[in-house]
UniProtKB/Swiss-Prot annotation:
PROSITE patterns referenced in this protein's UniProt entry, alphabetically: RIBOSOMAL_S7 (PS00052)
Name of protein: Small ribosomal subunit protein uS7
Source organism (scientific name): Roseiflexus sp. (strain RS-1)
Role played: One of the primary rRNA binding proteins, it binds directly to 16S rRNA where it nucleates assembly of the head domain of the 30S subunit. Is located at the subunit interface close to the decoding center, probably blocks exit of the E-site tRNA.
InterPro entries recorded: Ribosomal_uS7 (IPR000235), Ribosomal_uS7_bac/org-type (IPR005717), Ribosomal_uS7_CS (IPR020606), Ribosomal_uS7_dom (IPR023798), Ribosomal_uS7_dom_sf (IPR036823)
Molecular function (Gene Ontology), one example: rRNA binding
HAMAP family, per database record: Ribosomal_uS7_B (MF_00480_B)
A Pfam family annotated for this UniProt entry: Ribosomal_S7
Length: 157
């Protein structure tokens, strides 16, 4: 075991528009090559478009989409006696949010033909309604964990 203490996680300051740490983390994930102002513009335009289409507050749409897209259980490889088993483990809330935001962004980037803010808005709306590529990814991860339930006893030590 390492002798040094655990590192305290740095939480970014909340974003100026919605005063939400979660939105700021999402902006940081959208950001490429340090261009934060462009990332903010994309996220805010996507939020405005989603709010306009669903006629609900943008922050509520985003938080519900992240909640819907986050997996409850996932598999982690564990090596036991020369064999590697996929052991189902519960996902902690921080990782659940992080995975959900990452998957939302990946699914939005995988869509084609429209500006990024429109693709992101469409993916947020789909996740809000429990449909789309992000939700399919979550269900695949959870199905994999369910299929490997027999190995869950390896995760308890």
């Amino acid at each position: 075991m390492p002798r040094r203490g655990t590192i305290e996680r740095r939480i970014p300051p909340p974003d100026p528009r919605y005063n939400s740490v979660l939105v700021q983390q999402f902006i940081n994930k959208v950001m490429q090559r340090g261009k934060k102002s462009i990332a903010e513009k994309i996220v805010y335009q996507a939020f405005d478009l989603a709010a306009q289409r669903l006629k609900k507050p943008a922050l509520e749409i985003f938080e519900t989409a992240v909640r819907n897209a986050g997996p409850v259980i996932e598999v982690k490889p564990r090596r036991v006696g020369g064999a590697t088993y996929q052991v189902p483990v519960e996902v902690k809330s921080d990782r659940r949010q992080s995975l959900a935001m990452r998957w939302l962004l990946m699914s939005a980037r995988a869509r084609s033909g429209k500006p990024m803010y429109e693709r992101l808005a469409a993916e947020l709306i789909d996740a809000y309604n429990n449909t789309g590529a992000t939700i399919k990814r979550k269900e695949d991860v959870q199905r994999m964990a369910e299929a490997n339930r027999a190995f869950s006893h390896y995760g308890r030590f």
